[in-house]
């Protein structure tokens, strides 16, 4: 049996042209439920969720500051102005407290990579 989160990560990676390079799932309470082995969300999961809820103008992940480009109650897209990439949070579904967090290469188009991550997140409905 395959890992549904790894499958979603692979989908986002492939559909983004290899731009999505880190992936995780966190709960609204800040619990890390799954993360790819190339980053650690544990220290920042709670503050990431707070940033989404408050529609913060910036968010910090792994000591890197990202400026919020777009924020809704169910998503956040932020870019590091020094070129350290794009951070995306999107809710798996409206009735869940689970969120996908993804990091994409700085060369990615924010709107396009958001769509790739959101589509991958939606495949996780009821699976995590």
UniProtKB/Swiss-Prot annotation:
Lineage: superkingdom: Archaea
Keyword Cytoplasm assigned: yes
GO molecular function: actin binding
Membrane spanning stretches: none
Pfam families: Profilin
Subcellular locations according to the entry: Cytoplasm, Cytoskeleton
Gene3D superfamilies listed in its UniProt record: Dynein light chain 2a, cytoplasmic (3.30.450.30)
Keyword annotations from UniProtKB, A to Z: Cytoplasm, Cytoskeleton
Function according to Swiss-Prot or TrEMBL: Has no profilin activity against rabbit actin.
Family assignment from sequence similarity: Belongs to the Asgard profilin family.
Name of the protein in its database record: Thor profilin
Organism: Thorarchaeota archaeon (strain AB_25)
